[in-house]
Amino acid sequence: MKGLRFERIGTNRYYNVVFHMGSSYVPVSDDTVEELKAQSLLPVERFLELLVDRVGYSSYLKHQIRTELKSSGDPVTQITVLQGAIREL
């Protein structure tokens, strides 16, 4: 599946949420999920920077997120959808 998306994979696990970047994914801590939820009403550009900083904890992941964002259509729409999705996790 192309694009960026969050997925809840369970509860009471070490990682309950994963962030998909195309065919790859990275686990996301509950603390990071809560921080992103709290900041989900930021303007798109600022939320993107926060997302890349918190989820992309290595330069490789940061590059993967930005590359997938560029290749999957309108970046503003993708980030807006992610902002809504994170509030529902």
Predicted regions located by residue number:
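Amphipathic, interaction-prone secondary-structure segments
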Residues: 2-19
